[in-house]
Amino acid sequence: MISFKTVIVCLFLWVVIIGARHRPVKLDDEIFRDYHIDIDPSKSSCRCDDDGAEGSGTVWYGNCPSGWAMCTSSHYSAFAECCKQ
């Protein structure tokens, strides 16, 4: 006969698995918006070599989001890109 503890553990695991399968997943654009540097505009701008203007690009952590183009100075740092809209 199945013990009470075994039934409780199985129900708990079932709830965890069902809950994990139905978690909302963020889109890539939402993730990049969350990590966009917009606290101080003077620190979030970067030089985009395409047009040679200082501060014409915007620093994004990760890759450039959709609708943005990566500047020819592709990697701003090890973790960020210089992108322009």
From Swiss-Prot:
Gene Ontology MF term list: toxin activity
SUPFAM superfamilies per record: Defensin-like (SSF57392)
Region forming the signal peptide: 1-20
Cysteine disulfide links: 46-82, 48-71, 64-83
InterPro entries in the record: Myo_ane_neurotoxin_sf (IPR023355)
Keyword list, A-Z: Disulfide bond, Signal, Toxin
Short name of one Pfam family: Toxin_4
Superkingdom field: Eukaryota
Cited function: Probable toxin.
UniProt-recorded name of the protein: N.vectensis toxin 6
Species for this entry: Nematostella vectensis (Starlet sea anemone)
